[in-house]
Amino acid sequence: MRKRISAIIMTLFMVFMSCNNGGPELKSDEVAKSDGTVLDLAKISAKIKEASAFAASVKEVHTLVKSVDTLAGAIGKKIKSDGKFDAMAGKNGSLLAGAYNVALDINSKLTVLDGKAGLSSLLKAKVTAAKTSGESFSNKLKTEHTDLGKEEASDDNAKAALLVTNATKNKGVTELEALNTAVDALLKAAEGEVEAAIKELTAPVKVEKPSQNN
């Protein structure tokens, strides 16, 4: 995100340098391109800042969703004295509780994003879809508490809840896959909004072709 902000600052500088101040009198936050197009730098900069901040928040959610895969890698394992893993079958209750806590955090962050004012219709739809998928995942884990909410939760049940590559997906994986798809789409849309805001600055000047008539 720091690299993106640096690039935005550089873009603003280049736009300012490439614009002229001829023509009508401009306000302090405005510049004019060579074709006469007036850019409100304050407005465009604010739009870029808002889009970038929103995309950063979505990236946090995306990272949390992907972290469930990392947790799934610890199913049926314990740490050895040499730092490696050893088998510990049928003791996955705490791991599943941790995954459920992550799911609740995902829901909380998506609820905040869903309440943001001024979202485009596309972003609003993507946030709502991700929020719905997140709630479906956490609700599924809660519904399966008989098998998942105990210290002796089996490896098979834990994998059916958290491991997306598992053949059996009836304790949460189906919902987790849908959440992954939804949050991927949300991140893509959020990054697209940033790019669209930047393009307002970098759109090329339209040059009229000279007349072919003598």
Swiss-Prot record:
GO terms for cellular component: cell outer membrane. It is a lipid-anchor. InterPro entries: Lipoprotein_OspC, OspC-like_sf. Coiled coil: none annotated. A lipid is attached at C19 (N-palmitoyl cysteine). A lipid is attached at C19 (S-diacylglycerol cysteine). It is found in: Cell outer membrane. The keyword Signal applies. Its main location: membrane. The keyword Zinc does not apply. Residues 1-18 form the signal peptide. Keywords: Cell outer membrane, Lipoprotein, Membrane, Palmitate, Plasmid, Signal. It comes from the Bacteria. Pfam families: Lipoprotein_6. The Vlp and Vsp proteins are antigenically distinct proteins, only one vlp or vsp gene is transcriptionally active at any one time. Switching between these genes is a mechanism of host immune response evasion. Genes for both Vlp and Vsp families are on (usually) unnamed linear plasmids in B.hermsii HS1. Belongs to the variable small protein (Vsp) family. This is Variable small protein 1. The lineage of its organism: Bacteria, Pseudomonadati, Spirochaetota, Spirochaetia, Spirochaetales.
